[in-house]
Amino acid sequence: MNILLCSINTQKGLYDISGVEVGQHLYWQIGGFQVHAQVLITSWVVIAILLGSAIIAVRNPQTIPTDGQNFFEYVLEFIRDVSKTQIGEEYGPWVPFIGTMFLFIFVSNWSGALLPWKIIQLPHGELAAPTNDINTTVALALLTSVAYFYAGLSKKGLSYFGKYIQPTPILLPINILEDFTKPLSLSFRLFGNILADELVVVVLVSLVPLVVPIPVMFLGLFTSGIQALIFATLAAAYIGESMEGHH
C-alpha cells in the first residue's frame, strides 16, 4: 500500500513539474488558439527592421552604388557564396530561403543586445530576442526540414527515399533517426547559445559596474553572428545533401 501511495505521489510530482514554465509569458487568445505574444512582437520588430532597411537601401538603385546599396550587394554576394558552396550549381532557387534564414537569425540575435527591450513593460514577462525563445528556433528548424525534404522530392521523386537504405538496409533506422536529429540539433544549438549569452550579460550587469560587461557584450555579438552563419550553412548543406544523395 505504501509503495502504491509512493508511486502515485511520484507520478503527481512529475506531472506538476511538467507544467512548470521558465519565466512568465504574455499570451494572446486568437480564436481558439493561445499565441505567445512576446515572440510575435519581437519577430515583427525584426521583420520590420529588415524590410525597412532593404527598402531604404535599394529603393532607387544607382549606377554608382550608395553605401547602403553596396552593403546589401555585399550581403547578397556572401549569401550566394554560402549557398553555392553547400548546395552546388543548382543553388539559385535556394538563395532567398538561405538569405532569409541568415538575415532573420542574425538581426534577431543582435536585437537581444542592441535593442532596449527591457524598456517596454508588459503585463506578464518581458521582451527579448526572438531566438531567445525555443518556439522560434524550433519553427526555423522545422522550416529547414520541410525545405530539404521538398528539395529532395522535387528533384528525385519517390526515389529520394531510397537514400534511407544506402549503403545497406541495415542502416535504415539510423538514417531515419538522422532526419529527426537534424532539426533538434539546429533548434537547441541556436536557442541554447542565445539564451546563455543573454543570461551571462544580465548576471554580469547585476553584479559588476556597466563597463566590465561591455567586452562580454561584444563577444556575444560576435558569437551571435557566428550562430546565424552556422544555421544558414547547415540548412544549405542539408538541402544540398538531399538533392545530391546520402553522404
From Swiss-Prot:
GO cellular component: chloroplast thylakoid membrane; plasma membrane; proton-transporting ATP synthase complex
Keywords carried by this UniProt record: ATP synthesis, CF(0), Chloroplast, Hydrogen ion transport, Ion transport, Membrane, Plastid, Thylakoid, Transmembrane, Transmembrane helix, Transport
Entry membrane topology: Multi-pass membrane protein
Protein origin, superkingdom: Eukaryota
Listed GO MF terms: proton-transporting ATP synthase activity, rotational mechanism
DNA repair as UniProt keyword: no
Subcellular localization(s) per the UniProt record: Plastid, Chloroplast thylakoid membrane
PROSITE patterns: ATPASE_A (PS00449)
Transmembrane spans: 38-58, 95-115, 134-154, 199-219, 220-240
InterPro entries referenced in this protein's UniProt entry, alphabetically: ATP_syn_F0_a_bact/chloroplast, ATP_synth_F0_asu, ATP_synth_F0_asu_AS, F0_ATP_A_sf
Assigned protein family: Belongs to the ATPase A chain family.
Alphabetical list of NCBIfam families matching this protein: ATP_synt_6_or_A (TIGR01131)
Function field: Key component of the proton channel; it plays a direct role in the translocation of protons across the membrane.
Subunit record text: F-type ATPases have 2 components, CF(1) - the catalytic core - and CF(0) - the membrane proton channel. CF(1) has five subunits: alpha(3), beta(3), gamma(1), delta(1), epsilon(1). CF(0) has four main subunits: a, b, b' and c.
The protein, known as: ATP synthase subunit a, chloroplastic
The organism of origin for this protein: Cucumis sativus
Lineage per the UniProt record: Eukaryota, Viridiplantae, Streptophyta, Embryophyta, Tracheophyta
